[in-house]
A protein has these predicted regions:
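Short, extreme N-terminal segment that most often corresponds to the first beta-strand
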Residues: 1-25
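A short, exposed loop/beta-hairpin motif centered on an aromatic-Gly-Thr core
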Residues: 16-31, 36-42
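Low-complexity intrinsically disordered segments
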Residues: 33-201
Length: 201
């Protein structure tokens, strides 16, 4: 079965805020030329691309002044392991069906995205925990698409469901930045080292 994901901002091993990808509506064109609106996909490789609107929504939260700027981030999969001492993983913690007294986290209503022009300026995904950065513009291109490093680097649960990344990951990049302090920047912070992100399917 397919594994669904939610980008989450976490604190003390709990999801504080999250985005539901179906809430991010994009215009699509059918083969007959008719335009329609549809939410972005829930599976990891349905939305993990540069210029994808869900990715641009998370980028907007991670730029200077954004609500998630320099905060710990996880792309939480629903098949990921539960948190220590809990039956819930971060995906199930971010559940709006919980009653108010049980609620741990809150869904961001009507998430806003960077424009394509703005997104292209914030090309550095920065990890302030490891003092590393990735230049998303260098992500390998295939059939006109580039995988966005942010979601794969912070993913938990990959490889356990349909729609997960199935390409080669010889350096163990996937999930290596999960729960780290992340931001999107226009410039490389002084003293930070580049991490080469070369994953492709």
């Amino acid at each position: 079965m397919g594994q669904y994901y939610k980008p989450c901002q976490i604190e003390n091993k709990k999801a504080i805020e999250w985005i539901y990808s179906h809430d991010v509506q994009s215009k699509w064109t059918r083969d007959d030329g008719k335009v329609f609106m549809m939410g972005e996909g829930l599976k990891l490789m349905e939305h993990s691309y540069v210029r994808n609107k869900l990715m641009q929504c998370v980028e907007k939260l991670l730029i200077p002044g954004g609500d998630w700027y320099k905060k710990p981030i996880v792309w939480a999969g629903d098949y990921a392991a539960p948190e220590e001492g809990s039956e819930d993983n971060l995906f199930s913690m971010s559940d709006e069906e919980r009653t108010e007294g049980e609620r741990i986290s809150f869904k961001i209503q009507s998430p806003k995205a960077l424009t394509l022009a703005q997104s292209s300026k914030y090309k550095f995904v920065v990890n302030h925990t490891t003092k590393q950065y990735v230049d998303k513009s260098k992500s390998p291109e295939r059939d006109g698409y580039q995988i966005h490093p942010l979601s794969l680097l912070t993913a938990e649960g990959n490889g356990q469901g349909g729609g997960d990344f199935r390409g080669r990951d010889s350096k163990g990049l996937i999930g290596s930045w999960a729960r780290n302090i992340i931001s999107m920047e226009k410039e490389i912070p002084t003293g930070y080292k580049e991490l080469i992100f070369n994953l492709k399917e």
